[in-house]
Structure formats: structure tokens, C-alpha cells
Amino acid sequence: MKKTIFIIAIIVCLASCTNQKPLYSWYNYNNVSYNYLKNADEQSTQQMIETYQKIIEKQKGTRQAVPPGIYADYGFLLLQANREEEGKAMLMKEIALYPESKIFIDRILKMMEK
């Protein structure tokens, strides 16, 4: 009896060591965003836009949803690149997916109107 309980306990412990699938797929976001913030040139901006598009289009995490803030960051980047319609659409998607971001997004939109 004790031997059976011990074996079951070991199996449970080993089963808990398996890799968990991440909630979101980030691809190479950390490196690309670091490069963008460090250089802030045209090439790094284009890489950042491509990374955002990949995160949005190819989400493979367990939630199958775009991570919080990605639509907002992408929209703000598009607004800065004078792609206003696309940028505003991304900001609206952020609000639709994460309603608690509405106050922050409204501030961004007011700031961009000035």
C-alpha cells in the first residue's frame, strides 16, 4: 500500500514537470522591441510593424488571443508613421478586446489630434 502511494506520488510529481504551452505567442518581440527602442530608425520600425502583424495574425498560444497592449502599441506606431486610419482601427480593436484600456486609448487619440 505504501509502495503504491509512493509510486503514484512520484508519477504526479513528474507529470507536473512537463512544459506548459504559453498563453500567448510572442515570436521575437523582445529582441525586436529592444532593437526598435535602441535604434528608432526606419529599419527597426519596419521590423517592429512586421512583428506586430505576425503576433496578431498567427497567435498560437493557449488563449488564441492577441496579448494585451499589442493592438494599442501597434496602433500607436501606425499613428506615428502617419497611417492614421489603420492606427485608429488597431486602437479600437484594443478597446474591443480589452475594454479596461478605453481610458488610456482615449488619451492617446486626444494626444494625436493636437
Regions found by a protein language model. Give the residues of each.
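Structural register within alpha-helical repeat arrays
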Residues: 73-74
